[in-house]
Amino acid sequence: MWPESAESPAPLRTGLTTGTCATACCVAAAQALFADQQAASVSVTLPKGKVVDLPIIEYQTIDAGMKTSTIKDAGDDPDATHGATLFVELRLSPEQGVRFRAAQGVGIVTRTGLLLDVGEPAINPVPRKMMTEHLKGFAQTYHYQGGFDVSVGVINGEQIAQKTMNPRLGILGGLSILGTTGIVRPFSCAAYIASIHQGIDVARANGLTHIAATTGNASEDAIKSHYQLDDMALIEMGDFVGAVLKHIKKVEQADFAKLNSSTQLQTLSICGGFGKISKLAQHHMDLNSRASSIDLGALAKLAASLGADNALQERMTKANTSVEALSFAISDGLPLADAICQQALDFARQYIPAHIALEVWAIDRKGQFVGKALDADNSKRDEP
């Protein structure tokens, strides 16, 4: 079994990535082919050297090879692939090397900007390296001079992929085989954050100069309609605004250092519900309720700077929600949402290079814009 997470007083189980599962299937298939053993479980060495055991639920002889399957266990992480059946069809080949293919339920890359070339199966570099190293170990042990054809698949993967960012990223036909450490940390949301980074990379690589990062469906619909943006320009960041800001800073500054302006962004729009934007205005980079809360007193203080009297400030401080506090301010004719958007913009601005025009938009629960802040000067300066 794999270890429990130490971050929680009541330990949460860590899980294993799809890349680790695929590697286990490779190990099981190779063991069956070379040693004529069909073990109930196999051991896999993770990138940092830790060894984990995974159960193998199926062995099936195929032409020139073996098919093996395992069940993806994400531990206590809310992972879309948790419980999915992942399989590998491993075939021996007279041609040396290891070649990867997408079987049923694994996607194909159709857009530039990802870690893989267009036309490649969506099996990321670290899982490829893990599988290759384990297979080379078998080849060395058994003095095998040939190569391997590895087809990785996921039962119902095409349907599961609709719950992920893959279609928007241009990974079509199924899931991606992922992993960098081999382990899924509960609620680390590493895969989701990686998809945010990939969305930004794909948009930039395909020449888009304006992207919009949104907290949910309503904010996405609002900003998409306002600017008539292409789906590729829409980054569903959820609560992870920090992932957007930090990644844009990183990649844009890297291109600036290379004097490469061909992929640089010109405009970033951040759009979300008033409560989420209020958290950003209060310097929170994770907008989830478990990680941050709204300071109603700070909202009231901001309203005071706009002319709110003591009675209104007290009502706002005692409001049930930030949206209710906003409604009190609106009733008094105060542009609180615009002011919140401006505070959020001022905070986000420190992460976003100066050549990018920054916007922050807030919507109400009906998906209507209630506030906005735009860069006062959209002329681009010379340095990020």
From Swiss-Prot:
**GO MF, one example:** cobalt-precorrin-5B C1-methyltransferase activity
- What SUPFAM superfamilies does the entry give? CbiD-like (SSF111342)
EC number, UniProt record: 2.1.1.195
Q: Does the keyword Methyltransferase apply?
A: yes
Keyword NAD in the entry? The reply is no
The pathway to which it is assigned is:
Cofactor biosynthesis; adenosylcobalamin biosynthesis; cob(II)yrinate a,c-diamide from sirohydrochlorin (anaerobic route): step 6/10
Main enzyme class:
transferase
List the GO biological process terms.
anaerobic cobalamin biosynthetic process; methylation
Q: Which Gene3D superfamilies match?
A: CbiD-like
Q: Name one Pfam family in it.
A: CbiD
Recorded catalytic reaction(s): these are: Co-precorrin-5B + S-adenosyl-L-methionine = Co-precorrin-6A + S-adenosyl-L-homocysteine
Keywords linked to the UniProt accession: Cobalamin biosynthesis, Methyltransferase, S-adenosyl-L-methionine, Transferase
Stored InterPro entries: CbiD, CbiD_sf
Q: Which family does it belong to?
A: Belongs to the CbiD family.
What PANTHER family does UniProt report for this protein, alphabetically?
A: COBALT-PRECORRIN-5B C(1)-METHYLTRANSFERASE
Instruction: Please identify the protein, giving its name as recorded.
Output: Cobalt-precorrin-5B C(1)-methyltransferase
Gene encoding it? Answer: cbiD
